[in-house]
Amino acid sequence: MKPTLCFLFILVSLFPLIVPGNAQCSFESLVDQRIKEALSRQEPKTISCTSVTSSGRLASCPAGMVVTGCACGYGCGSWDIRNGNTCHCQCSVMDWASARCCRMA
């Protein structure tokens, strides 16, 4: 056998040991394992929502809840959320305001 061919044969047979493919796979499996462990420790969360309607321009959510949407009387579509828990209808004449309030349970 020629020396070049012999060297090539040795190099090809050692190639799987040189390539760090196993190191990458073990790192990925370690990361996957850690993610699965973290997810298994979490408790499932549910969302709990309710609507609050009041007369006037303001509708406030109960303690611990945040506004996720507002509705206003007289077809008013102009509103904003104040302090994260109160709907404020911005039209000049307003008979009612409603807030959709939610929390994670």
From Swiss-Prot:
Tissue-specificity statement: Strongly expressed in colon, and at lower levels in ileum. In colon, found throughout the crypt and surface epithelium and in goblet cells (at protein level). Specific to the gastrointestinal tract; not detected in other tissues tested.
InterPro entries found in the cross-reference section: RELM (IPR009714), Resistin-like_sf (IPR036262)
Job description of the protein: Probable hormone.
Pfam families membership: Resistin
Keywords (A to Z) from UniProt: Disulfide bond, Hormone, Secreted, Signal
UniProt family annotation: Belongs to the resistin/FIZZ family.
Originating species: Mus musculus (Mouse)
Signal peptide from the UniProt entry: 1-23
Main localization of the protein described in the UniProt heading: secreted
GO biological process: response to bacterium
MF terms (GO), sorted A to Z: hormone activity
Induction conditions: Up-regulated in colon in response to a high-fat diet. Also up-regulated in obese mice mutant for the leptin receptor LEPR (db/db genotype).
Assembly description: Homodimer; disulfide-linked. Heterodimer with RETNLG.
Encoding gene (name): Retnlb
A cellular component annotation (GO) from this entry: extracellular region
Name of the protein in its database record: Resistin-like beta
Entry annotated with the keyword Amino-acid biosynthesis: no
Subcellular location: Secreted
